[in-house]
Amino acid sequence: MGFITKAIPIVLAALSTVNGARILEAGPHAETIPNKYIVVMKKDVSEESFSAHTTWLSQTLNSRLMRRAGSSKPMAGMQNKYSLGGIFRAYSGEFDDAMIKDISSHDDVDFIEPDFVVRATTNGTNLTHQDNVPSWGLARVSTRKPGGTTYYYDPSAGKGVTAYVIDTGIDTKHEDFGGRAKWGKNLVDQMDEDCNGHGTHVAGTVGGTKYGLAKGVSLVAVKVLDCEGSGSNSGVIKGMEWAMMDASGGGNGTAKAAGKAVMNMSLGGPRSEATNQAAKAISDAGIFLAVAAGNENMDAQHSSPASEPSVCTVAASTKDDGKANFSNFGSVVDVYAPGKDIVSLKPGGGTDTLSGTSMASPHVCGLGAYLIGLGKQGGPGLCDTIKQMATDAIQSPGEDTTSKLIYNGSGK
């Protein structure tokens, strides 16, 4: 397991343009969901105009259902509506070809793209320390050279910061979380549990007491992937919207302020303009977002959200500072982090050892929380801080790819 995705080198291509609206298609290897689409509005569309558009949509769908009653199985219509920071407005649902044609001719629509399957991405002077660390990644991020067995960190340890784990859920009762993990939102099923294990492993690296980088951080589970580690692109965007709202105080207000929040997305799929715009809206709201680069050993520009420039895209390194053979690479990668044979938590207690850029990304998310706890500025600029602090360590990082490996600035 690891980066749960089957992202392949796919670039969305415009099929047609009708009155300015683009109808996009995913490449031949994307696992599209029949008749499911994401409709994204133009950036200058107001909330009032968006509401008027969705009213028109409902009325048009109802009118068509009445005309063809009994002739065929009706489409579900709009199922999700999104509004992220007044920047990204969109909706998703089930529509037939005729309805998509009508939607594409609407002046307020920017583009339409098919919904598809997304998967998790698995295959100081006042320092304290943790000796004989259970996972090599902890020692590696706090020392300038490989081979260490001690994790050096400031005792602030990310206290006062909230980390949103957008994944398969978290076993919030696992003893290593020490009561700091809670459920936020479940957008997949009725089971507030991690029946896959991926999300718990990721959360353990972010903020477990023994296995995490930010040992004092608060953790929030946002479940967008099922027991098989898969979900829909539209569902992932809905989870992103909820997390952003909560981090900004619009939901339960767990984080109190966006600048005290970090997010991790160890998941991905083919490049999606809708996903990238949603990720940018999160960054624009002042929230630090770490994402997995992907596990296909290809250029990460073909995967989302990894290809979004405003997020912190993370490739996976090995114990001897090499590029993990599965890790994606390319100019969109911001940093490397440990991602091979990472020990972290599993649901029900105990641990598991997993590899993937899914395991690398939470090292960066945890480091982000740790640095905010030390007083560093949060938001997308935090990725620049992390890059500046990183060591030039990765051997043969890949074509047009950084050799920077994350470092927490311990001085060791």
UniProtKB/Swiss-Prot annotation:
Residues 135-412 form the Peptidase S8 domain. One of its GO terms (cellular component) is extracellular region. It comes from the Eukaryota. Glycans are attached at residues 252, 264, 325, 408. It is an enzyme of class 3 (hydrolase). Residues 21-127 form a propeptide. One of its GO terms (biological process) is proteolysis. PROSITE patterns: SUBTILASE, SUBTILASE_ASP, SUBTILASE_HIS, SUBTILASE_SER. GO terms for molecular function: serine-type endopeptidase activity. PANTHER family: CEREVISIN-RELATED, PEPTIDASE S8. This is Subtilisin-like protease 6.
